Regions:
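Conserved, well-structured interaction surfaces
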Residues: 21-94, 108-117, 126-142
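A structural signal for well-ordered alpha-helical segments within the folded catalytic domains
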Residues: 49, 53, 148, 152-153
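Outer-membrane beta-barrel proteins
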Residues: 139-146, 164-165
């Protein structure tokens, strides 16, 4: 994730590079065709799907745990929020990916999902998160996803899809 804001900055109107590092200049021109570029594509892709894998583990296993239902739903909502965040980044950078919604074993080969299928899942995850996350956390849990964070990310997802109504 440390490269992500840098990557978006380079792709913005303010992005510019005179670096001899070719890929940095490519990013300023929205050229992402060096798929061997370790920091640019491989690291982000892997880290996003590791995050999604972890969220799927929570979403698959926490429902079976006996605990307070409000706390359980908050945990599930946090995992849903984070999974939506990872898929949001995937759609922004690559406009498609694989939609993996359950834990899988090592021989699983996922199928490509369309950009719209991923947006639909983002909306579903964020709607659940908004319904179950608190408005705020106490100081010990500061930094966790909140209802406002889920609303804001859902708003960004709508804007990316040109859903203004």
């Amino acid at each position: 994730m440390r490269w992500l804001s840098f990557r978006y900055d380079l792709s913005s109107d303010e992005g510019w590079s005179s670096s001899p590092w070719i890929e940095l200049g490519d990013w300023t021109r929205f050229l992402y065709n060096n798929y061997d570029f370790y920091e640019g594509n491989k690291v982000h892709w892997e880290h996003f799907y590791v995050g999604i894998f972890r969220c799927n583990q929570v979403l698959a296993n926490v429902p079976a745990i006996e605990m307070d239902e409000v706390q359980k739903n908050q945990l599930l909502a946090q995992a849903s929020f984070l999974r939506a965040l990872w898929y949001f980044q995937i759609n922004l950078l690559w406009e498609k990916g694989t939609l993996v919604l359950e834990p899988q074993n090592a021989d699983y080969i996922p199928k490509d999902a369309s950009e719209q299928e991923i947006w639909d899942q983002i909306e579903k995850d964020l709607t659940f998160a908004m319904e179950n996350l608190p408005e705020a956390w106490d100081a010990a849990d500061l930094g966790r996803a909140t209802k406002g964070a889920a609303k804001a990310l859902l708003g960004k997802a709508y804007m990316q899809q040109h859903k203004y109504d």
